[in-house]
Amino acid sequence: MENRSVERVRENLKEIRFRVEEACVKCGRDPSQVTLMAVTKTVPAELVNAAVAEGVTLLGENRAQELLEKFDSYFLPPEQIHFIGHLQTNKVRQVIDKVGMIESVDSVRLAAEIERCAAARGRTMEVLVE
């Protein structure tokens, strides 16, 4: 991993945090109440972990295959990883143990499959419905 890439992650996070803080101040909101989610779309696990090392505590993955490929490399537990993209019903059982929330439930059929797979593992899955 190039040092320039890691430095760019640091600089980007610094800028994003500054912008979030500015926006919060403008609307009278406490910046500590805002959670930054780093979306990992096509970003190598090494750079994602550089963001985690800089204090990012929540990841968003939008592709099941990428999540499966990178999951074991992440420095965060499943509870701090959200699935944010369209999830195909046939991929639910592959990602159910790797995320703490599925933010993209767009059908009753998908919700039922999530419930079935989660129950089979003795857990519940938090979801957001589109």
PLM segments and residue spans:
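Conserved alpha/beta-domain cores
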Residues: M1-E130
